[in-house]
Amino acid sequence: MTAAENVCYTLINVPMDSEPPSEISLKNDLEKGDVKLKTEALKKVIIMILNGEKLPGLLMTIIRFVLPLQDHTIKKLLLVFWEIVPKTTPDGRLLQEMILVCDAYRKDLQHPNEFIRGSTLRFLCKLKEAELLEPLMPAIRACLEHRHSYVRRNAVLAIYTIYRNFEHLIPDAPELIHDFLVNEKDASCKRNAFMMLIHADQDRALDYLSTCIDQVQTFGDILQLVIVELIYKVCHANPSERARFIRCIYNLLQSSSPAVKYEAAGTLVTLSSAPTAIKAAAQCYIDLIIKESDNNVKLIVLDRLVELKEHPSHERVLQDLVMDILRVLSTPDLEVRKKTLQLALDLVSSRNVEELVIVLKKEVIKTNNVTEHEDTDKYRQLLVRTLHSCSVRFPDMAANVIPVLMEFLSDNNEAAAADVLEFVREAIQRFDNLRPLIVEKMLEVFHAIKSVKIYRGALWILGEYCSTKEDIQSVMTEVRRSLGEIPIVESEIKKEAGELKPEEEVTVGPVQKLVTEMGTYATQSALSSSRPTKKEEDRPPLRGFLLDGDFFVAASLATTLTKIALRYVSLVQEKKKQNSFIAEAMLLMATILHLGKSSLPKKPITDDDVDRISLCLKVLSECSPLMNDIFNKECRQSLSHMLSAKLEEEKLSQKKESEKRNVTVQPDDPISFMQLTAKNEMSSKEDQFQLSLLAAMGNTQRKEAADPLASKLNKVTQLTGFSDPVYAEAYVHVNQYDIVLDVLVVNQTSDTLQNCTLELATLGDLKLVEKPSPLTLAPHDFANIKANVKVASTENGIIFGNIVYDVSGAASDRNCVVLSDIHIDIMDYIQPASCTDAEFRQMWAEFEWENKVTVNTNIIDLNEYLQHILKSTNMKCLTPEKALSGYCGFMAANLYARSIFGEDALANVSIEKPIHLGPEAPVTGHIRIRAKSQGMALSLGDKINLSQKKTSL
């Protein structure tokens, strides 16, 4: 710390355009001015002293003319003045004038006004001169007996601070405060006194607690919090004391203060692993979540429950509380509900899954009865996914869940309906006994489906799993009902012509007969080429989709019709019925092809859809055994393989999670005997208070030992050269929302450098919080300068600047050393994250910013390149490992990450290895990045480009 910093620890901005007052004018105002003028003058004196001015001539003036005043504002300002003014001579001896000031302190400590007494006591806590405090000790002791609690609690603080700094001034402080604590009634005074005993004489604090341990519940919350802290520290240092105080912690779980309950529950978990203790703490957490209105509090406490679940023995206890945890679903916040459902799903077992499903079904029904809202739709999706997972893990529950969920296939919210469809598809494949039920329910809701995407999926399921004549006939009936009158073109033209009034039937051009590809005649007029606007709600669903130009559903329908027709032929032996059914299926396909080629739809049919429908027509016309196997066996096997791979992937990830959580004990691990263990080694748990303090200070200890590159030295950036007059290097410490630059500045010359200033500026979404203050560097001296930079979003930022200084005694202009740029790494703010394929596709469609990066590397292996990109970008690969295994010369993978600011980043890697260039040919291709903000997309692209260049060196 420099000499300037030693005195000037607070900087107050002074307007540059104002003239600084002279010492003479200030002295005149302090001597002859009224109270208002003296107040203003005293403020100016304080600011000048804080900014480094000495003003020794004003000390006696203030003692003579300002100190005797009884004005409260002046007394407040005087306390600040006495705190900052130099009180000693250069050789360290107390100034003679301070004896007069000491007498003024004593009078204020005996002042009838309790505020003046209390504020003086608070001021005495900041004094570091024992000679000033010694004469005041009797007055400070007397304040412990004052009638007002404000004076008493500040007297306790003053005694504690003096005892800690100068124990010889009041050696009996612990005994004095203990006696005071026994007789005190005010909660804040008791809290301060008890806090002092904890730090000054812990044994006395424990003795006091032992005498009143049964009355702890009646204490104020501020004292209860201190008691919890004491019990934790004592039991952490000396585990044998746990039995003595654990009952007190149990009692504090019933406190009226949420803060006390939270701390008591956390302490109880660290002190005891008994099932009763864990259950009591968990129950306390659940009550807090339900009763607290702040969603942030709910999420914090939910995180504590999740931490409890990570311990295998605690998890078994929490499984009995699943139904209590589900009470949290009454909270309207989506994030809280999401975390609650995930926790309940992790804890559910065969004992309580039935009750869980009943509650979730009720919640699903509730979402129908509330006003539609974006969060309601998302909550419904969460419930569907949770029920889906329950049914897969506990197949017996599927029969209860399916009827409720099938109703949502006709929901207006396509996302929720898609989740239901995914669940139904998996259930009908896995559970053979449920197929008749699912097909029956699917046929019931089929006509009410509003989304073309859901309609396609439902068609596929019906075509794949209808195995009886009756079901096949029912599917055909539903398709005919959904398609309406056929042929579609003729019926639509008639319908439109019939809806027109006689005076509106004006033919723009001559009516002509056209021969279609099928060899039939189609009448076309101006009416069919420009249709009038009309209501479309009365159209059957499938007909509406086709007229809107969505012929992809027609291709799906053709496949379904082919499957059920081939299956019908195998079930029914009568040739006439076989031919009739096949002819009906072919007629439907033909009429759709006819519609697609006409001008009635909003968009014409695509060539791909024409090819698909034509192929199905050909299959039905030939009915070969090979095509029969492909349509009725191979398709189902493909689904089976996909679901098996998905299940295997989930099991593998669960296994990895459980392996992380399970702490295995090795055969050669040492056995700990309590009687033979030193006190400081007794508890294996870390001190939670110390950890929370470190976290608050931004000193969270990361596991850096395993990776030497993650050490602090790796984050040191050289800012100037070794030959520059001033050498500078910076350690870049990245916190969540800000960056701290710790800059080492070294004077490499033989001159004294005055007004040495670090001037910084930023590019990107960075903001310099405050300008570093100038300093003076002696020859070959060094100093550390800290600068804070605020970060607002995930974007590559650059910090640049220079160091300017004056050389002592030189008449030249200011000297300047330009600093190297500091690049802020986007990777410090990006974390791997997961999302479903549907969510990925939805975000991909919504995000408007795309950055396409061309692959330019010397890596020759596709998998190696993908792993390199994952490591460089901190993203997670969503594509299953099995889909990436093997070698076929090309690879496609989806990557996802989320920033600490809640921004999503998507990437699609599409790479190949050109075989014609030989085995040593590098990987080629491109990476497409999508994000909501331009900065995120560009920054991630820059990072990938940079990492590729490093690889190719």
Curated annotation (Swiss-Prot):
SUPFAM superfamilies: ARM repeat (SSF48371). HEAT repeats lie at residues 17-54, 96-131, 132-168, 240-276, 277-314, 316-353, 396-433. GO terms for cellular component: COPI vesicle coat; cytosol; Golgi membrane. Its main location: cytoplasm. It is a peripheral membrane protein. GO terms for molecular function: structural molecule activity. The keyword Membrane applies. It holds the Pfam family Adaptin_N. It is found in: Cytoplasm; Golgi apparatus membrane; Cytoplasmic vesicle, COPI-coated vesicle membrane. Keywords: Cytoplasm, Cytoplasmic vesicle, ER-Golgi transport, Golgi apparatus, Membrane, Protein transport, Repeat, Transport. Oligomeric complex that consists of at least the alpha, beta, beta', gamma, delta, epsilon and zeta subunits. The coatomer is a cytosolic protein complex that binds to dilysine motifs and reversibly associates with Golgi non-clathrin-coated vesicles, which further mediate biosynthetic protein transport from the ER, via the Golgi up to the trans Golgi network. Coatomer complex is required for budding from Golgi membranes, and is essential for the retrograde Golgi-to-ER transport of dilysine-tagged proteins. This is Coatomer subunit beta. The lineage of its organism: Eukaryota, Metazoa, Chordata, Craniata, Vertebrata.
